[in-house]
């Protein structure tokens, strides 16, 4: 597989993934299930910041479904780590487990360079 930086609207590079619940699928199969697919990369299921993002996606997932959209969330965590912590029904959307970071490499998703790099640009601004 070639590594390629993609932009909004580009055709995504297909890959095979395993969910925390023992299913194997491909991105190509997944995108056929809805009009729009949001491919989201977070790091580890145990990361507090990632947990906040996951909770927000779970709480707002019906809004995605209402627009014929879906989420495929890539986490650099082992399937068992996630399956032991949350059920498939509670999660609501599909997770692609990538403990070796191969998908992060494929899509050139690097780590944050600093703690500040993890924060939203909105942090610290008056609302």
What are these regions (language model features)?
Residues 1-29, 52:
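N-terminal "domain-start" segment that seeds a small globular fold
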Residues 53-105:
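Structural microenvironment flanking redox-active thiols in thiol-disulfide oxidoreductases
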Residues 93, 98-125:
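Thiol/selenol-based redox catalytic cores and closely related redox-interacting motifs
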């Amino acid at each position: 597989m070639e590594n390629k930086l993609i932009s909004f609207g580009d055709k995504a590079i297909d890959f095979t993934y395993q969910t925390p619940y023992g299913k194997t699928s491909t991105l190509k199969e997944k995108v056929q299930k809805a009009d729009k697919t949001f491919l989201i990369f977070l790091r580890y299921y145990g990361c507090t910041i990632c947990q906040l993002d996951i909770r927000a996606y779970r709480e707002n997932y019906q809004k995605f479904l209402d627009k014929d959209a879906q989420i495929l969330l890539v986490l650099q965590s082992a399937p068992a780590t996630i399956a032991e912590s949350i059920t498939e029904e509670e999660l609501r959307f599909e997770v692609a487990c990538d403990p070796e970071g191969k998908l992060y490499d494929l899509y050139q998703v690097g780590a944050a360079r600093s703690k500040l790099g993890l924060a939203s640009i909105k942090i610290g601004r008056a609302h």
